[in-house]
């Protein structure tokens, strides 16, 4: 089941990124607020608006400064309602260093919004894991940021995020986005 979910997510990622409205690459410096572990997280995101809905995929790889790696894939679908995007989806986490039986799947729900402020675009959101297995780590992530266009299709961004519940982290990031 997990391999089927991962394969479905990767197929969706390939199809979405090929026909995407945007692709982005972000890098965050992350600090665990419990054990002080530091990592660098890289995100590839792609999204498509169609038929009044939006579909997004996120692939995240975190490399820890003292060794170790985490990978996850999330696929979400959402709808804008009064300027707020409500979304839900599914994720797959490969576990620390791909440890045998360390991987798990989860659902997720969230809200995000953004607004232009002069030449900039501000954004914020919140998402939380909906675990169907109580042994899996709980996590709620909040984020906010600002994006600045460089050209009509290219923008750079800076963001802050905070994770709460079982996973407690703070992150500062920068990104590059190309819109089509």
Annotate each language-model stretch with its function:
Residues 2-180:
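Outer-membrane beta-barrel proteins
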């Amino acid at each position: 089941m997990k391999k089927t979910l991962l394969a479905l997510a990767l197929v969706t990622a390939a199809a979405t990124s090929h026909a995407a409205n945007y692709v982005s690459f972000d890098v965050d410096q992350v600090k665990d607020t419990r054990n002080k572990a530091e990592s660098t997280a890289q995100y590839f995101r792609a999204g498509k608006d169609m038929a009044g809905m939006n579909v997004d995929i996120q692939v995240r790889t975190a490399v820890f400064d003292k060794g170790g790696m985490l990978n996850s894939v999330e696929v979400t679908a959402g709808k804008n309602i009064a300027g707020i995007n409500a979304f839900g989806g599914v994720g797959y986490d490969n576990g620390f260093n791909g440890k045998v039986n360390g991987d798990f799947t989860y659902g997720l729900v969230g809200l995000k919004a953004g607004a232009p402020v002069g030449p900039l675009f501000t954004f914020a959101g919140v998402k939380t894991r909906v675990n169907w297995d109580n042994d899996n780590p709980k996590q709620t992530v909040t984020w906010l940021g600002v994006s600045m266009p460089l050209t009509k299709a290219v923008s750079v961004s800076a963001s802050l995020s905070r994770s709460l519940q079982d996973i407690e982290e703070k992150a500062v990031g920068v990104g590059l986005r190309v819109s089509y």
